[in-house]
Amino acid sequence: VMMSGKRWGYVVQFFCLLVFLGMSPFLTKMDGRKTMSVSSDSVRSQNVSDEVKPVVALTFDDGPNASSTPILLDGLKERKVRATFFLIGENVEKDENEKIVKRMYEEGHLIGNHTYTHCNLSKLETGEAKKELEQTDTVIEKITGKQPVFARAPYGELPVDSEQDLSRIYIGWTVDPLDWMTEDTGAVVKTVVEEINPGDVILLHDCYPSSVQAAIRIVDLLQGKGYEFVTVDHLIMD
C-alpha cells in the first residue's frame, strides 16, 4: 500500500518525537494504513521500576456526546481508567457538553484537539486548517484553562504544514476496530482483544452507544489480562 506524502510526514513527525524521547518505534500496517506505536520492549525499558503490567492507551474521537459520553466516563471512573479524548470543537459547544469536558479534565483524562468541524485538514488551505485547530484550542482552553498539545487529524490526514507546527503533537492509532461502521459490540471487542499488544493505541468513538459498551467490555477483558490503561502522553513520554 502506497502512503501519501502528507501521511508519511505524519509518521516521520511522530517518529522524530519518539527518537527524541529515546524510544524505539515500529510501524504497523492495519486496514491499508500505517501508523506509529511503541513496542512492548521500548515501553518497559522506559520504566525505571520495570513495571510488570503492559500498558496501552484508550482513545476516543468525535465527542463529546451528551448521552453516551457520560456513560463512558462513569464506566472508566468505576474501573480507575484514564483515557484520551480528541474532541470536536463544535460538539463541545453543543447543549451541556461543556460540563462533560470539565468533568473529563477533572477526572484526569487527557483532552486533545480533533478540529472544529471534523474536516479533512489536508484539503484545506494553511490558514483554514489553522483556524479549525485554533478555534478548538480556544473552546477547550476556555473550559480547562489549558491549551491542548495533542491532536488527532480526522481521517489521519494532516495539514500541509504539520511538520512545521512544533506546538502540536499529532497522535495516530494502531488498533482500529472500525466501531463507527457497526453496532455489533461483540465484533468490536473481539477485534481489539485479538489484535492488542503492549504499547498500542486503541481508536474508538464515544459518540456511539455501542462503542461505549464495547469500550467498557474491552477495559474489563484487558485488565483481566494484566493490562494497564494510560493516556497517550504517558504512553509516549514515560
How should these model regions be labeled?
Residues 10, 16-17, 101, 114, ...:
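Homeobox/homeodomain signature
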Residues 119-228, 233-238:
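Catalytic domains of cell-wall/extracellular-matrix polysaccharide-remodeling enzymes
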Residues 5, 9, 22, 32, ...:
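Residue-identity detector for glycine
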Residues 33-122, 128-129, 135, 139, ...:
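Active-site beta->alpha N-cap acidic-glycine motif
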Residues 1-58, 74-83, 198-238:
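Terminal accessory/targeting
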